[in-house]
Amino acid sequence: MTYWRSIFLVLLGACSYGVLSIFMKHAFQLGFTPFEMSGSQLIFGGLIMTAMAIFFSKQRFSFKYLLLLAPASLMMASTSLFYHQAVSRVSASLAIVLLFQFTWIGVLLEAIVDRKWPTAEKWVSLAMLGAGTVLASGLSESGIQSVDMVGLIFGLMSGATFALVIFFSGRILPGMDPYLRSAISISMAALMLSIVYPPTFLVNGQLLQGLLPLGLLVAIFGSVIPIFCLAVGVPRIGNGLATILSAVELPTVVLLSNFVLQETVSLPQWGGVFMILAAICVPQVKWRKLFSPSHALEQERM
């Protein structure tokens, strides 16, 4: 039961990150900048998780955790920074395709570290994810025209750093209390981002102009829920599978765009959504067992 609960939590975290796009789009329409929103996401997320850790964590804080979790926090802050830079330079559809390179990067990273070649199921799943991502993003219809190379590089870097976020979630202190771990990781990521982009929105009156409620929403759906779910789920199911499951983020974005934002979703995009969902299920099917003679005999007896 713990295994399937962990799968559910990773899926929930990825879906939550997909919901983030709804609030981000509304925030940009109101005139808030990507840096104000990413800063709000991490700063408010860190405060919320710190409060939760104070009340619910069963593990005591130690300064050594700051050093051990620093790589995860750095990748978290980098993903936010790189992705927003990519969105500002290339189309949204291309940016999300570039971000979704985390799927094969994550599986490859696990294979290199563990010195274990990915299973056939994972290769099939990755191929389906690649095709489904291009279709669901709408890139197959709009095409790529005069791509900004700087934006392209930032997009690929966001995919690489997000793969490392998932990787570190399963490798660094896997048995650590998830409340304390999430609080430290998000808070340090907020501090790192603030060094590059000082959070002037905290003192320039933007919070009272509508940024506060939006900042809290992006913090909950973009930091608190996904990071906590990854902290709980990834150590129990492994990095490779968690990376593939996290691809459910894109179908969530497409579904919300259609039903909440009332945006038109084409037939190829729907096909991409179903292909991604099918790809997520592939690693869970025991194909060799399913087609083995013993399994067929078992089915006949039933």
State each model region's role:
Residues 1-36, 40, 74, 78, ...:
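Glycine-/small-residue-enriched transmembrane alpha-helix faces in small-molecule transporters
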Residues 4-9, 35-52, 121-131, 150-157, ...:
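Hydrophobic alpha-helical transmembrane segments of multi-pass integral membrane proteins
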Residues 8, 40, 95-101, 168-191, ...:
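Helix-helix packing/entry segments at the starts of transmembrane helices
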Residues 16-21, 56-94, 99, 133-135, ...:
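Specific transmembrane alpha-helical segments of multi-pass solute transporters/efflux pumps
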Residues 27, 37, 41, 86, ...:
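Hydrophobic/aromatic residues within transmembrane alpha-helices
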Residues 42, 138, 211, 247-302:
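C-terminal-most transmembrane helix of multi-pass membrane proteins
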Residues 48, 53-57, 83, 102-127, ...:
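C-terminal transmembrane-helix exit sites in multi-pass transporters
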Residues 49, 70, 121-140, 193, ...:
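Hydrophobic transmembrane alpha-helices of multi-pass small-molecule transport proteins
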